């Protein structure tokens, strides 16, 4: 079903979240609302009974065309804690492996009365395509699409930063590693810019840097890690995505670690209270050494905890936005 050209695809007529495809174009107030809502859901995870009834009677379908243990599991937990029914589609054994198109798969899932799709796909733009073509009553959440976006990872990273560092307006944040292939890097740069971070640094070899980062995201680019890490408050390490690389981008993983790997010595260039983050999975000895990943400044496991709360916030807000839009359209029809 084509989207209304007068309204941004992700928002309803009242500016509420309806789909969550990308952080691009979303206002600061909405990102802050997601963070505030997630903060309130963190308390749910500390209870003996970790459930609230916000999505009772709703069905959330996780459609993962690309493998992911952490993202899929946290989305499942988030939906279950909101009391939704959850279906997780194993694409490798589904009809898509027998030639069924993406649209046909979604139509069949719609026929099962799913209220929301969480989609992960190797093609950039897949989540947007799905949001444009599903029934108007179905919300679509992007669980990662190609190199394009991973908006819930971006927001859980922002929640991690805010809970450890307060507001964003005095911070220096460095994103280090395979920027070229990273949807996480793109989502983080957009979120940091929108939330008012004044100093966003990107550190990578030239071969792993997209063209035009400075103009598009307002970041500072460094090819020397030691220079880029000086006095930063937050270090976000990214893994080398070998599965998306073609030959010639790197001489070797050992050379990458020597020049860009986060060691205890290199971390000392950052502020003494700097935090270390990583979206996972971690390649120890490639982009980060174990002493840092497991050290006192690491908040990597906190990111996983906060990820459940962020996904609870996004699922509940998108479902609420869909319900509001449906009510508005019914009132207009009357």
Swiss-Prot record:
Residue sites binding L-aspartate per the record: 98, 183, 239
Molecular function in Gene Ontology: amino acid binding; aspartate carbamoyltransferase activity
Gene3D superfamilies membership: Aspartate/ornithine carbamoyltransferase
Protein's GO biological process: 'de novo' pyrimidine nucleobase biosynthetic process; 'de novo' UMP biosynthetic process; amino acid metabolic process
Keyword annotations from UniProtKB, A to Z: Pyrimidine biosynthesis, Transferase
Record carries keyword Transcription: no
Pathway assigned in UniProt: Pyrimidine metabolism; UMP biosynthesis via de novo pathway; (S)-dihydroorotate from bicarbonate: step 2/3
UniProt EC number: 2.1.3.2
Substrates-to-products reaction catalysed: carbamoyl phosphate + L-aspartate = N-carbamoyl-L-aspartate + phosphate + H(+)
Annotated carbamoyl phosphate binding sites: 70-71, 120, 150, 153, 280-281
Entry-linked Pfam families: OTCace, OTCace_N
Keyword Transferase part of the UniProt annotation: yes
NCBIfam families the UniProt entry points to: asp_carb_tr, PRK00856.1
Subunit text: Heterododecamer (2C3:3R2) of six catalytic PyrB chains organized as two trimers (C3), and six regulatory PyrI chains organized as three dimers (R2).
PANTHER family: ASPARTATE CARBAMOYLTRANSFERASE, ORNITHINE CARBAMOYLTRANSFERASE, MITOCHONDRIAL
Function: Catalyzes the condensation of carbamoyl phosphate and aspartate to form carbamoyl aspartate and inorganic phosphate, the committed step in the de novo pyrimidine nucleotide biosynthesis pathway.
Protein known as: Aspartate carbamoyltransferase catalytic subunit
